[in-house]
């Protein structure tokens, strides 16, 4: 998670790691519980730091190519074990309960750009990808609000 101000400046970053959930034989129910609790902690952290808008990757836009996400067995297992729809729905519900405005952002290219920016920003790849998602969301909001103002004057 990256917390940005209205100008797109990073104010804070927070990452939750739990690599064990992708291990072969790790119980799916326990993995789900770990993911959802981590998401709750991140949203609580954002709430108590004055965040009002949350941008989530629109995970439904991530498509698999030929039934595979990547070319490695380990990567394919991780992708197939990841309950993206469930996590997104739960995240949206929890964010709305906390009073956040919620927007979904097309994640296309965010990981690649995040990887490229990570060295310059001195952040890990996940935090820099979250930064890119935040910038895309802020750009959408600024563009959308600008077009709404134009509509009011017509």
What are these regions (language model features)?
Residues 1-154:
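Positively charged, helix-rich recognition surfaces that bind polyanionic ligands
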